[in-house]
A protein has these predicted regions:
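Non-catalytic macromolecular-recognition regions in eukaryotic signaling proteins
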Residues: 2-121, 127-308
């Protein structure tokens, strides 16, 4: 009996040691030599303060955070706002850091004279002193002055679908739809334009309702209807497009199964319009976003792609 207990104890110790060794090996196999900053394709507006959300991957067992991002072309430095969202996986952390810059008056005047500020090459500094020189993708800071439409609703979902509804005082004609990140996104951004839709018209007037049950019924009916909307590549839309009463722009981010799926997108497509009096206007859509939902497997694919 004592011998059996001794054997069981020995086997238990061996099993624990083997499990520990296997765990250490797994950690080493999945370890990345440095943080992986995703490519970002973003468009933000020029203000005295500008925020950037940056996504990056780190080893799970190492506490490392972005302190700052420096863009040497324009001598701009964004600093950490002490906000970080972390999604913990088995071997990695998928992080989102928010960084901020405050521009002085001279900088604002200088940049307002430029059509666009395009940020690509970046130097990232971490809280452990590590520095990385990377191509961050393409971040566009613009100072466009828009004469826009009146938006009554804007929404987006985790599936990549988004919708914006505009209430129109007069009929308008949409002549063109453009984006400063068109070349980077036109293969997977699709749209549909709808005018004077009964549900959209009802939604515009929903604030006049006082019956909460009635409001919920209208909203449920409205959102269920979105499942049947088919979107098309922007260059296949029938333009010019005339709209009256309401204009809804439906957008679907249909990500391709290629390297783009590892990138982050927060882009703007701009509607260029003319009203019935011949006045020209432009209105950007602000809810077209995509960011990858990482699993350990997807991170390993990205690590292999980056050669780390």
């Amino acid at each position: 009996m004592k011998k059996n207990k001794k054997k069981i104890l020995i086997f238990g110790v061996i099993a624990c040691i083997f499990s520990l060794i296997l765990n250490i090996v797994n950690i080493q196999v999945h370890k990345i030599s440095e943080p992986i900053v995703l490519e970002h394709y973003l468009e933000v507006s020029l203000h005295d303060e500008i925020d950037l959300s940056i996504n990056y991957i780190t080893n799970k067992r190492y506490s490392i955070k972005i302190n700052s991002i420096y863009f040497p072309k324009y001598d701009l430095t964004f600093y950490d706002k002490n906000f970080q969202d972390t999604n913990s996986l088995k071997y990695y952390n998928s992080n989102t850091a928010v960084l901020n810059i405050r521009l002085n008056l001279d900088q604002q005047k200088e940049y307002e004279e430029m059509d666009n500020i395009i940020l690509e090459d970046a130097v990232i500094t971490y809280n452990n002193g590590l520095e990385q020189n990377i191509d961050i993708g393409k971040i566009i800071i613009n100072n466009n002055k828009e004469k826009g439409l009146r938006s009554t609703m804007s929404s987006s979902s985790s599936t990549g679908f988004s919708k914006t509804v505009f209430e129109l005082d007069n009929s308008i004609i949409i002549n063109d739809i453009t984006s400063k990140l068109y070349e980077e996104t036109h293969n997977f951004v699709k749209m549909n334009l709808v005018t004077n839709d009964e549900l959209d018209n009802t939604l515009v007037n929903i604030s006049k309702e006082t019956d909460k049950d009635k409001i919920m019924e209208i909203e449920d009916n409205y959102h269920n209807n979105q499942k049947d909307i088919e979107c098309y590549p922007v260059d296949e839309l029938q333009l010019p497009f005339q709209a009256y009463n309401t204009l809804s722009v439906n957008t679907n981010f249909e990500m391709l199964d290629n390297d783009c799926k590892y990138n982050v997108y927060d882009i703007r497509y701009t509607l260029h319009s003319t009203d019935e009096n011949g006045n020209e206007g432009s209105q950007s859509l602000y809810n077209i976003r995509y960011s990858p939902y990482f699993t350990d497997k997807l991170v390993r694919q990205l690590v292999k792609k980056r050669g780390l």
